[in-house]
Amino acid sequence: MAVKQKQVFVNDRPHLNIGTIGHVDHGKTTLTAAITKFCSEEGGGYEADFRAYDNIDKAPEERQRGITISTAHVEYKTPERHYAHVDCPGHADYIKNMITGAAQMDGAILVVAGTDGAMQQTKEHILLAKQVGVGSIVVYINKCDSSELDEELLELVESDIKDLLISHGFDLPEDEEDGSNPAIIRGSALLALNGEESELGKGSIRKLLAACDKYIALPERAVDGDFLMSIEDVFSISGRGTVVTGKIERGCIKVGDGVEIVGIRDTQKTTCTGVEMFNKLVEQGEAGFNVGILLRGSKREDVCRGQVLCKPGSITPHRKLRARIVTLTKEEGGRRTGFVSGYKPQFYFRTTDVTGTAYLPVDGAEIVMPGDDLEIFVELLNPIAMEKGSRFAIREGGVTVGAGQVLEIMDSKTDAEIAKMFKIVRAVKN
Protein backbone atom coordinates (compact mmCIF):
# COMPACT_ATOMS: atom_id res chain seq x y z
CA MET A 1 0.00 0.00 0.00
CA ALA A 2 1.43 3.36 -1.04
CA VAL A 3 2.19 5.83 1.73
CA LYS A 4 0.30 9.10 1.30
CA GLN A 5 2.77 11.94 0.73
CA LYS A 6 2.57 15.00 2.95
CA GLN A 7 1.60 18.24 1.23
CA VAL A 8 4.25 20.95 1.14
CA PHE A 9 3.30 24.20 2.89
CA VAL A 10 3.37 27.09 0.39
CA ASN A 11 4.75 30.25 2.00
CA ASP A 12 3.47 32.74 -0.62
CA ARG A 13 2.61 35.75 1.57
CA PRO A 14 3.65 37.27 4.92
CA HIS A 15 2.80 35.12 7.95
CA LEU A 16 1.17 36.43 11.13
CA ASN A 17 0.05 34.73 14.35
CA ILE A 18 -3.28 36.06 15.56
CA GLY A 19 -6.02 35.01 17.97
CA THR A 20 -9.33 35.81 19.58
CA ILE A 21 -9.43 37.01 23.19
CA GLY A 22 -12.23 38.31 25.39
CA HIS A 23 -14.89 37.45 27.96
CA VAL A 24 -16.64 34.08 28.07
CA ASP A 25 -19.73 33.81 25.82
CA HIS A 26 -18.95 37.03 23.95
CA GLY A 27 -18.58 35.04 20.71
CA LYS A 28 -14.87 34.30 20.19
CA THR A 29 -15.34 30.78 18.84
CA THR A 30 -18.35 31.77 16.71
CA LEU A 31 -16.26 34.57 15.18
CA THR A 32 -13.35 32.18 14.51
CA ALA A 33 -15.72 29.81 12.70
CA ALA A 34 -17.25 32.73 10.76
CA ILE A 35 -13.81 33.90 9.59
CA THR A 36 -12.93 30.44 8.24
CA LYS A 37 -16.31 30.20 6.49
CA PHE A 38 -15.94 33.64 4.91
CA CYS A 39 -12.39 32.90 3.69
CA SER A 40 -13.42 29.50 2.31
CA GLU A 41 -16.24 31.03 0.21
CA GLU A 42 -15.15 34.56 -0.72
CA GLY A 43 -12.48 33.88 -3.38
CA GLY A 44 -10.28 36.74 -4.61
CA GLY A 45 -7.25 35.66 -2.58
CA TYR A 46 -9.14 34.58 0.56
CA GLU A 47 -8.50 30.93 1.43
CA ALA A 48 -9.41 28.59 4.31
CA ASP A 49 -10.89 25.25 5.18
CA PHE A 50 -14.18 25.97 6.94
CA ARG A 51 -14.07 24.96 10.61
CA ALA A 52 -17.48 24.68 12.24
CA TYR A 53 -18.03 25.91 15.81
CA ASP A 54 -18.23 22.35 17.17
CA ASN A 55 -15.01 21.42 15.41
CA ILE A 56 -13.08 24.32 16.98
CA ASP A 57 -14.63 23.82 20.42
CA LYS A 58 -13.94 20.10 20.18
CA ALA A 59 -13.12 18.49 23.54
CA PRO A 60 -16.21 16.83 25.11
CA GLU A 61 -16.02 18.76 28.38
CA GLU A 62 -15.77 22.01 26.42
CA ARG A 63 -18.97 21.35 24.46
CA GLN A 64 -20.87 20.18 27.52
CA ARG A 65 -20.06 23.29 29.49
CA GLY A 66 -20.42 25.60 26.50
CA ILE A 67 -17.02 27.19 26.97
CA THR A 68 -13.63 26.79 25.31
CA ILE A 69 -10.96 25.36 27.58
CA SER A 70 -7.96 24.60 25.37
CA THR A 71 -6.58 26.66 22.51
CA ALA A 72 -7.66 25.64 19.00
CA HIS A 73 -5.51 26.40 15.95
CA VAL A 74 -6.95 27.31 12.52
CA GLU A 75 -5.39 28.88 9.43
CA TYR A 76 -6.67 31.19 6.71
CA LYS A 77 -5.39 33.57 4.06
CA THR A 78 -6.40 37.07 3.01
CA PRO A 79 -5.11 38.57 -0.26
CA GLU A 80 -2.34 40.17 1.83
CA ARG A 81 -1.35 37.59 4.46
CA HIS A 82 -1.35 34.06 5.83
CA TYR A 83 -2.79 33.86 9.36
CA ALA A 84 -2.34 31.18 12.00
CA HIS A 85 -5.21 31.80 14.43
CA VAL A 86 -5.64 30.55 18.00
CA ASP A 87 -9.04 30.63 19.65
CA CYS A 88 -8.22 31.43 23.26
CA PRO A 89 -10.35 30.43 26.24
CA GLY A 90 -12.33 33.11 28.01
CA HIS A 91 -13.38 31.50 31.27
CA ALA A 92 -11.56 32.88 34.32
CA ASP A 93 -10.66 29.38 35.56
CA TYR A 94 -8.63 28.79 32.40
CA ILE A 95 -6.49 31.91 32.28
CA LYS A 96 -3.48 29.59 32.44
CA ASN A 97 -4.37 28.29 28.98
CA MET A 98 -5.08 31.81 27.77
CA ILE A 99 -1.54 32.78 28.73
CA THR A 100 -0.22 29.90 26.64
CA GLY A 101 -2.36 30.92 23.68
CA ALA A 102 -1.60 34.62 23.91
CA ALA A 103 2.10 33.85 24.02
CA GLN A 104 1.68 32.68 20.43
CA MET A 105 0.12 35.88 19.12
CA ASP A 106 1.64 38.78 17.19
CA GLY A 107 -1.74 40.50 17.29
CA ALA A 108 -5.19 39.81 18.71
CA ILE A 109 -8.85 40.26 17.88
CA LEU A 110 -10.60 41.40 21.05
CA VAL A 111 -14.21 40.21 20.95
CA VAL A 112 -16.66 42.24 23.04
CA ALA A 113 -20.41 41.65 23.09
CA GLY A 114 -22.12 44.98 22.46
CA THR A 115 -24.89 43.82 24.79
CA ASP A 116 -22.46 43.55 27.74
CA GLY A 117 -19.52 45.83 26.99
CA ALA A 118 -16.13 45.26 28.61
CA MET A 119 -16.28 42.72 31.46
CA GLN A 120 -13.73 41.58 34.05
CA GLN A 121 -12.22 38.89 31.82
CA THR A 122 -12.06 41.40 28.93
CA LYS A 123 -9.82 43.57 31.10
CA GLU A 124 -7.67 40.67 32.29
CA HIS A 125 -7.17 39.41 28.73
CA ILE A 126 -6.05 42.88 27.57
CA LEU A 127 -3.59 43.04 30.47
CA LEU A 128 -2.29 39.54 29.78
CA ALA A 129 -1.97 40.29 26.06
CA LYS A 130 0.26 43.26 26.91
CA GLN A 131 2.33 41.21 29.35
CA VAL A 132 3.05 38.40 26.91
CA GLY A 133 4.04 40.73 24.08
CA VAL A 134 0.98 40.96 21.82
CA GLY A 135 1.84 43.95 19.63
CA SER A 136 -1.52 45.15 18.30
CA ILE A 137 -5.23 44.64 18.93
CA VAL A 138 -8.24 45.14 16.68
CA VAL A 139 -11.72 45.03 18.20
CA TYR A 140 -14.82 43.18 17.03
CA ILE A 141 -17.97 44.40 18.79
CA ASN A 142 -20.22 41.36 18.49
CA LYS A 143 -24.00 40.82 18.74
CA CYS A 144 -24.71 44.23 17.18
CA ASP A 145 -27.89 42.76 15.66
CA SER A 146 -29.44 42.62 19.15
CA SER A 147 -32.67 44.55 19.65
CA GLU A 148 -31.27 45.70 23.02
CA LEU A 149 -28.70 47.94 21.31
CA ASP A 150 -28.94 51.44 19.91
CA GLU A 151 -26.31 53.83 18.55
CA GLU A 152 -25.81 55.59 21.89
CA LEU A 153 -25.11 52.34 23.72
CA LEU A 154 -22.70 51.16 21.03
CA GLU A 155 -20.80 54.45 21.18
CA LEU A 156 -20.47 54.05 24.96
CA VAL A 157 -19.14 50.51 24.53
CA GLU A 158 -16.65 51.70 21.88
CA SER A 159 -15.47 54.58 24.05
CA ASP A 160 -15.00 52.31 27.07
CA ILE A 161 -12.97 49.76 25.07
CA LYS A 162 -10.86 52.49 23.47
CA ASP A 163 -10.00 53.96 26.90
CA LEU A 164 -9.23 50.48 28.25
CA LEU A 165 -6.83 49.65 25.41
CA ILE A 166 -5.06 53.01 25.54
CA SER A 167 -4.63 52.72 29.33
CA HIS A 168 -2.83 49.39 28.77
CA GLY A 169 -0.49 50.84 26.15
CA PHE A 170 -2.24 49.74 22.94
CA ASP A 171 -2.48 52.33 20.16
CA LEU A 172 -5.71 52.66 18.18
CA PRO A 173 -5.76 54.42 14.80
CA GLU A 174 -8.14 57.35 14.32
CA ASP A 175 -9.80 58.50 11.12
CA GLU A 176 -8.54 62.03 10.45
CA GLU A 177 -11.88 63.20 9.07
CA ASP A 178 -14.44 61.97 11.60
CA GLY A 179 -12.30 60.77 14.55
CA SER A 180 -13.69 57.23 14.33
CA ASN A 181 -11.59 54.15 15.05
CA PRO A 182 -11.21 51.95 11.94
CA ALA A 183 -9.71 49.16 14.08
CA ILE A 184 -13.03 48.81 15.96
CA ILE A 185 -15.50 46.80 13.86
CA ARG A 186 -19.19 46.32 14.60
CA GLY A 187 -20.87 43.10 13.54
CA SER A 188 -22.62 39.84 14.32
CA ALA A 189 -20.49 36.70 14.14
CA LEU A 190 -23.65 34.57 14.08
CA LEU A 191 -25.11 36.42 11.08
CA ALA A 192 -21.77 36.05 9.28
CA LEU A 193 -21.57 32.35 10.13
CA ASN A 194 -25.09 31.92 8.74
CA GLY A 195 -23.91 33.53 5.50
CA GLU A 196 -25.96 36.72 5.69
CA GLU A 197 -24.84 39.28 3.09
CA SER A 198 -25.16 42.41 5.22
CA GLU A 199 -22.99 45.05 6.85
CA LEU A 200 -23.25 43.28 10.23
CA GLY A 201 -22.89 39.81 8.67
CA LYS A 202 -20.27 38.95 6.03
CA GLY A 203 -19.53 42.66 5.57
CA SER A 204 -18.21 42.85 9.14
CA ILE A 205 -15.82 39.92 8.55
CA ARG A 206 -14.53 41.60 5.39
CA LYS A 207 -13.91 44.82 7.38
CA LEU A 208 -12.34 42.92 10.27
CA LEU A 209 -9.84 41.09 8.06
CA ALA A 210 -8.99 44.33 6.24
CA ALA A 211 -8.34 45.95 9.64
CA CYS A 212 -6.11 43.02 10.65
CA ASP A 213 -4.14 43.36 7.40
CA LYS A 214 -3.74 47.11 7.85
CA TYR A 215 -3.42 47.70 11.59
CA ILE A 216 -1.73 44.60 13.00
CA ALA A 217 1.89 45.22 12.15
CA LEU A 218 4.11 42.41 10.93
CA PRO A 219 6.61 41.99 13.76
CA GLU A 220 10.31 41.90 13.16
CA ARG A 221 11.13 38.20 13.27
CA ALA A 222 14.29 37.21 15.10
CA VAL A 223 15.22 34.90 12.21
CA ASP A 224 18.95 35.46 12.63
CA GLY A 225 19.05 34.68 16.36
CA ASP A 226 19.89 31.35 17.99
CA PHE A 227 17.02 28.89 17.50
CA LEU A 228 14.56 28.80 20.42
CA MET A 229 11.07 27.26 20.69
CA SER A 230 8.88 26.71 23.75
CA ILE A 231 7.38 23.23 23.76
CA GLU A 232 3.59 23.45 23.96
CA ASP A 233 2.74 19.79 23.34
CA VAL A 234 4.43 16.43 22.78
CA PHE A 235 3.19 13.56 20.60
CA SER A 236 4.44 10.09 19.75
CA ILE A 237 3.96 9.00 16.13
CA SER A 238 4.23 5.26 15.52
CA GLY A 239 7.20 4.43 13.33
CA ARG A 240 8.49 8.02 13.22
CA GLY A 241 9.27 9.05 16.79
CA THR A 242 8.48 12.01 19.00
CA VAL A 243 7.05 15.31 17.75
CA VAL A 244 7.10 18.54 19.76
CA THR A 245 4.93 21.52 18.82
CA GLY A 246 5.16 25.21 19.58
CA LYS A 247 5.92 28.67 18.24
CA ILE A 248 9.50 29.36 17.16
CA GLU A 249 10.56 32.35 19.25
CA ARG A 250 13.74 33.10 17.31
CA GLY A 251 16.10 31.64 14.76
CA CYS A 252 15.49 28.87 12.21
CA ILE A 253 15.50 25.08 12.18
CA LYS A 254 15.81 22.53 9.39
CA VAL A 255 16.27 18.79 9.05
CA GLY A 256 19.64 17.66 10.40
CA ASP A 257 20.10 20.50 12.90
CA GLY A 258 21.32 19.49 16.35
CA VAL A 259 19.18 20.82 19.22
CA GLU A 260 18.91 20.67 23.00
CA ILE A 261 15.84 20.12 25.18
CA VAL A 262 16.27 22.45 28.17
CA GLY A 263 14.45 23.09 31.45
CA ILE A 264 12.63 21.23 34.25
CA ARG A 265 14.71 18.05 33.70
CA ASP A 266 18.34 17.36 32.74
CA THR A 267 19.33 18.90 29.38
CA GLN A 268 19.12 16.42 26.48
CA LYS A 269 20.75 16.55 23.04
CA THR A 270 18.89 15.39 19.91
CA THR A 271 18.53 16.05 16.17
CA CYS A 272 15.67 17.48 14.10
CA THR A 273 14.48 14.92 11.51
CA GLY A 274 11.43 16.79 10.20
CA VAL A 275 9.58 20.13 10.33
CA GLU A 276 5.85 20.49 9.68
CA MET A 277 3.35 23.35 9.70
CA PHE A 278 -0.39 22.54 9.71
CA ASN A 279 0.52 18.92 8.79
CA LYS A 280 2.46 20.08 5.73
CA LEU A 281 6.20 19.71 5.32
CA VAL A 282 8.30 22.88 5.44
CA GLU A 283 11.89 23.14 4.31
CA GLN A 284 12.77 25.37 7.24
CA GLY A 285 10.92 26.55 10.34
CA GLU A 286 11.45 30.25 11.09
CA ALA A 287 10.81 32.64 13.97
CA GLY A 288 7.08 33.26 14.29
CA PHE A 289 6.01 29.93 12.78
CA ASN A 290 3.86 27.44 14.74
CA VAL A 291 5.49 24.11 13.90
CA GLY A 292 5.79 20.45 14.75
CA ILE A 293 9.37 19.19 14.99
CA LEU A 294 10.27 15.51 14.78
CA LEU A 295 13.11 14.52 17.12
CA ARG A 296 15.49 11.62 16.60
CA GLY A 297 15.77 9.12 19.44
CA SER A 298 13.78 11.15 21.99
CA LYS A 299 11.12 9.23 23.92
CA ARG A 300 7.70 10.74 24.56
CA GLU A 301 8.14 10.38 28.33
CA ASP A 302 11.50 12.20 28.27
CA VAL A 303 10.03 15.46 26.92
CA CYS A 304 7.30 17.63 28.46
CA ARG A 305 5.38 20.84 27.90
CA GLY A 306 7.24 23.79 29.36
CA GLN A 307 10.70 22.75 28.24
CA VAL A 308 12.33 24.57 25.33
CA LEU A 309 14.00 23.32 22.17
CA CYS A 310 17.08 25.39 21.33
CA LYS A 311 20.41 25.66 19.57
CA PRO A 312 22.92 23.77 21.74
CA GLY A 313 24.41 25.99 24.45
CA SER A 314 22.28 29.05 23.63
CA ILE A 315 20.01 29.04 26.69
CA THR A 316 20.35 27.36 30.08
CA PRO A 317 17.98 26.44 32.92
CA HIS A 318 17.90 28.52 36.10
CA ARG A 319 16.17 28.59 39.48
CA LYS A 320 17.25 31.94 40.92
CA LEU A 321 16.47 35.34 39.45
CA ARG A 322 16.08 39.01 40.22
CA ALA A 323 12.99 40.47 38.59
CA ARG A 324 10.95 43.62 38.27
CA ILE A 325 7.28 42.95 38.94
CA VAL A 326 4.04 44.86 39.01
CA THR A 327 1.21 43.56 41.19
CA LEU A 328 -2.41 43.98 40.18
CA THR A 329 -4.96 45.92 42.17
CA LYS A 330 -8.21 44.38 43.40
CA GLU A 331 -10.03 46.30 40.62
CA GLU A 332 -7.75 44.68 38.02
CA GLY A 333 -8.58 41.24 39.38
CA GLY A 334 -5.53 40.89 41.64
CA ARG A 335 -5.14 40.24 45.37
CA ARG A 336 -7.25 42.09 47.89
CA THR A 337 -4.42 42.10 50.43
CA GLY A 338 -0.66 42.43 50.31
CA PHE A 339 2.04 39.79 50.68
CA VAL A 340 5.31 39.56 52.60
CA SER A 341 8.75 38.08 51.95
CA GLY A 342 8.50 34.30 51.55
CA TYR A 343 5.31 34.46 49.44
CA LYS A 344 4.86 31.29 47.29
CA PRO A 345 2.77 31.80 44.12
CA GLN A 346 2.98 30.12 40.70
CA PHE A 347 5.28 31.67 38.08
CA TYR A 348 4.30 31.21 34.41
CA PHE A 349 7.19 31.22 31.91
CA ARG A 350 6.17 30.71 28.27
CA THR A 351 4.26 27.41 28.32
CA THR A 352 4.97 26.26 31.86
CA ASP A 353 4.16 27.10 35.44
CA VAL A 354 6.36 26.42 38.45
CA THR A 355 6.03 27.18 42.15
CA GLY A 356 8.53 29.69 43.46
CA THR A 357 9.24 31.82 46.50
CA ALA A 358 9.32 35.62 46.25
CA TYR A 359 11.61 37.58 48.57
CA LEU A 360 11.41 41.36 49.10
CA PRO A 361 14.31 43.88 49.08
CA VAL A 362 16.01 44.49 52.44
CA ASP A 363 15.64 48.25 52.06
CA GLY A 364 11.99 48.12 50.97
CA ALA A 365 8.61 47.86 52.64
CA GLU A 366 7.66 44.89 54.81
CA ILE A 367 4.59 44.19 52.72
CA VAL A 368 3.82 44.48 48.99
CA MET A 369 0.41 45.98 48.35
CA PRO A 370 -1.78 45.42 45.27
CA GLY A 371 -0.66 47.89 42.57
CA ASP A 372 2.96 48.10 43.76
CA ASP A 373 5.91 48.04 41.35
CA LEU A 374 9.19 46.68 42.74
CA GLU A 375 12.19 44.37 42.42
CA ILE A 376 12.07 40.91 43.99
CA PHE A 377 14.26 37.83 44.24
CA VAL A 378 12.63 34.58 43.11
CA GLU A 379 13.73 31.03 43.87
CA LEU A 380 11.94 28.45 41.72
CA LEU A 381 11.24 24.85 42.71
CA ASN A 382 12.40 23.54 39.30
CA PRO A 383 14.93 25.00 36.84
CA ILE A 384 13.32 26.80 33.88
CA ALA A 385 14.98 27.86 30.61
CA MET A 386 15.23 31.63 30.87
CA GLU A 387 17.47 34.61 30.24
CA LYS A 388 17.61 38.30 31.05
CA GLY A 389 14.46 39.90 29.60
CA SER A 390 12.26 36.79 29.89
CA ARG A 391 8.72 37.69 30.93
CA PHE A 392 6.40 35.83 33.28
CA ALA A 393 2.99 36.06 34.92
CA ILE A 394 2.34 35.50 38.64
CA ARG A 395 -0.76 33.49 39.58
CA GLU A 396 -2.34 32.42 42.84
CA GLY A 397 -5.53 30.48 43.45
CA GLY A 398 -6.81 30.92 39.91
CA VAL A 399 -6.13 34.67 39.90
CA THR A 400 -3.46 36.68 38.07
CA VAL A 401 -1.81 38.74 40.79
CA GLY A 402 1.08 40.25 38.87
CA ALA A 403 3.58 40.09 36.04
CA GLY A 404 7.30 40.53 35.75
CA GLN A 405 10.47 40.52 33.73
CA VAL A 406 13.81 38.90 34.55
CA LEU A 407 16.49 41.51 35.28
CA GLU A 408 19.32 39.18 36.30
CA ILE A 409 20.03 35.45 36.58
CA MET A 410 21.33 34.83 40.11
CA ASP A 411 22.23 31.12 40.22
CA SER A 412 25.91 32.01 40.66
CA LYS A 413 25.25 34.30 43.65
CA THR A 414 25.91 32.89 47.13
CA ASP A 415 23.19 32.85 49.79
CA ALA A 416 25.17 35.49 51.70
CA GLU A 417 25.28 37.81 48.67
CA ILE A 418 21.56 37.40 48.07
CA ALA A 419 20.77 37.97 51.77
CA LYS A 420 22.47 41.39 51.59
CA MET A 421 19.93 42.44 48.95
CA PHE A 422 16.73 40.59 49.88
CA LYS A 423 14.84 39.49 53.00
CA ILE A 424 15.42 35.74 52.84
CA VAL A 425 12.86 33.94 55.00
CA ARG A 426 13.35 30.19 55.26
CA ALA A 427 10.74 27.78 56.60
CA VAL A 428 11.65 26.53 60.08
CA LYS A 429 11.90 22.72 60.26
CA ASN A 430 10.62 21.03 63.43
Swiss-Prot record:
Entry's localization field: Cytoplasm
Family named by the database record: Belongs to the TRAFAC class translation factor GTPase superfamily. Classic translation factor GTPase family. EF-Tu/EF-1A subfamily.
Which stretches does the entry tag as region G4? 142-145
What's a Gene Ontology MF term here?
translation elongation factor activity
Q: Which SUPFAM superfamilies match?
A: EF-Tu/eEF-1alpha/eIF2-gamma C-terminal domain, P-loop containing nucleoside triphosphate hydrolases, Translation proteins
- What are the disulfide bonds? none
Name of this protein? Elongation factor Tu
| E.C. numbers | 3.6.5.3
The record's subunit annotation is: Monomer.
Task: Give the highest taxon in the source lineage.
Answer: Bacteria
Q: Which UniProt keywords are present, listed alphabetically?
A: Cytoplasm, Elongation factor, GTP-binding, Hydrolase, Magnesium, Metal-binding, Nucleotide-binding, Protein biosynthesis
Provide the function of this protein.
GTP hydrolase that promotes the GTP-dependent binding of aminoacyl-tRNA to the A-site of ribosomes during protein biosynthesis.
GO-annotated cellular components: cytoplasm
Q: Which CDD domains match?
A: EF_Tu, EFTU_II, EFTU_III
Q: Which residues bind GTP?
A: 22-29, 87-91, 142-145
Report any Pfam family annotated for this entry.
GTP_EFTU_D2
Q: Indicate the enzyme's highest-level EC class.
A: hydrolase
Q: Which residues bind Mg(2+)?
A: 29
Q: Where is this region: G1?
A: 22-29
Q: Where does this protein chiefly localize?
A: cytoplasm
> Could you tell me which residues belong to the region G5?
188-190
Q: Where is this region: G3?
A: 87-90
Please give the catalytic activity noted in the UniProt record.
GTP + H2O = GDP + phosphate + H(+)
